[in-house]
Amino acid sequence: LGLVPGAGAQIEALRTAVGDTPITVAGKPYPPLLQETINRMQARRPVFVGDRLDTDIEGAHNVGIDSFMVFTGAHGKTDLVNAIPQQHPTAIGWNLRGLLAPRREASWHDDEVLCRGARAYVYGGVVRLDGPLITVDEQLDALWAIVQLTWRDGSLDAADALDALDQLP
């Protein structure tokens, strides 16, 4: 099928038809529905898992909870690199199984970022990679290192580094 319009497109069509803006929207990424879910579940440490940056991850950001981006749906590595701050997930994984694995931690060392066996650094405004890139997990480690750099400096060229992550959408 490819990408299809979500509820936001339907709400926008309704807004245009009636010529008014709703006072409150109870859908992602807006807080009411998410906050009500957290309250009803009495969640102490909720994590929002999703594949869309503009609804799932931004929704988590809007209610102040952690988010976990999976790569089995709508958005991929390039979307993540180019995400605006309120769409930055707090963690990433290939799918739901990633929730059971240790969380990816990125650490800065001078002008480079390390994540497990991956190293991302900048040379001449271009993001470069070192480390193994054979498995999906190794590529996710590298991606997590890359986004730390690009989220700090949006002018960096990460195209070649992203191309090396050939198992990620």
Model-identified regions with their sequence ranges:
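Asp-based, Mg2+/Mn2+-dependent phosphohydrolase catalytic module
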Residues: L1-P169
